[in-house]
Amino acid sequence: MQPQGQTGQVPIVQGNVADPNVEVHWYGDAAKKLLTSGTPGSENTPFSVWSGECDGPFAITFKSKSSMLDLSGLGKVRWVVKTSGFHVVRPVVKLADGTMLVGDHADASVPQLAAREFSFSDVRWIRLDPTRVVTVNGGRGAGPANPNNEIWVVNPDLTKVDEVGFADLMPGSGHGTGGYIHLGTVEVFGKAIPRGTATASNR
């Protein structure tokens, strides 16, 4: 959403989140260069965020102040995206133990803003360094040999997810047609788990 008084292309702020119970978190230096774009209510240029000025990989996540999320089972995301060049939008989760993961689901080659939906149960995950926003070994190196250089995180616990969001692992190309992502609304569907408890309820 666009808070009152915000005009033009400016870095996103907490006020761009429609739900006052949800915090936005930035990962990677380039995340602070993610800009607002478009006009609320416009059919031709709807309000969204745009990554063209992000000069490195970044991730943006959202955190409910009151609850964690159980995204196992039927947990899913519906978001509105547009991409340019070889850029893709990928899901990101931060688990209860602080581990950050980026998924292999990738929305690419979306020339106009369009709704995309996917289930977390269909996603494979790789560990993400939250500072550099790059993929890293998931910790299996201490165990048996990892065939084919695979670094997938095996059976991550998605029953208590602290934050959920998106990532673009490529630097943007700047203004004009080139390489970037647009992202409008983000809706997450799962079970709310009140912080400090282990009881899930429908959300």
Language model regions located:
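Beta-rich carbohydrate-recognition modules and glycan-binding surfaces
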Residues: M1-R203
